[in-house]
Amino acid sequence: MPLPTVVLRRLVSAGTALSALSALLAATAAAAAPQPLRFVLIPKVSHLWYDVVREGAEAAGAMIRQQTGRLTQIDYQPPARSEVELQAEILKEAIRSRPSGIMIDLLDAPRLRPLLEQARRQGIPVNLFDSEPPDGLPLTSIGNDFCKQARIASQRLVERLGGKGEVAIMQGVPTAPNHAIRVRCHQEVFARHPGIKVVATPIDQDSIAIAQQQALATMRLHPQLRGWVVADAGGGIGIGRALQTLGRAGQVQVVGIDDLPEMMQLIRAGVVDSTSATKPRAQGYWSILNLWQQGLSAPTIERIDTGIVVEGPASRGG
């Protein structure tokens, strides 16, 4: 027997009300759900060293998800080349996208300062890893004492050479704060030893391939060269490859920076003496935690020092 029209109307009305209530409850639940976090990681260039930084950042993101239930994305944005113009464009786009935070390894602190200030004005948490802030700009720096790291390396080279001989410094990216500090501190150590003469300071632009090319050219131009120090992670690897190409492994002393797998292989093979290394995974991890805490209105701190480790015979006093 068909239901009366009035009953049908009441059923339809009840169904509509239930649908509206369900939609309202779903919207309320969605609004109450924690919003995802997105942190932008901007290195100097695509590089194996930054892959390790990224691993540390991802580990911190996983910890935040575990503790808060919030989805956390690490948006890795490397410039195609280590050029400040490219890094500036990436930073501009990152600011426009209104992320939960930006961590950046500066290619040129003064030139990027206006963009860093813009991000701060817009309330976007920002910090620097493996770098130093522009003068007077209160940003947290996550990394190590770059001057101490360089002094460890250059003093080791002086000892290996008995305080005498021609040496060269591979510069990395001269405008990058950490590279510039290392070069200056290498030079300060060598200046205290009259028997040491710096004959070349080539630039590798944070590229292993360019470091190899520059090292080959430098050693052909200076056949009496006895030793190398570097300002970046790829420099020592490129020099090691050049020594192998020239058949001069063991004849020219090299003290590197950082402990990428190929660097450690070169040390084990006796091509590179030792290395004064940063801790890139720790830098990535603590950079993300610092950005997250900034988003929770934590006060700004000046520095998070992730330390230095010496690898190779120098670590054993050999």
Say what each PLM segment does.
Residues V52-R65, Q149-A153, P177-I196, I210, ...:
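Short, solvent-exposed amphipathic alpha-helices that sit
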Residues P110-K148, E166, L260-R268, V272:
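Flexible loop/hinge segments that line or gate small-molecule binding clefts
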Residues V7-S13:
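N-terminal export leaders
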Residues Q87, I142-V167, A209-Q212, D259-M263, ...:
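Hydrophobic alpha-helical segments within soluble ligand-binding/sensing domains
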Residues A33-Q35, N178, V189-F190, K279-G318:
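Hinge/cleft segment of the Venus flytrap/periplasmic-binding protein
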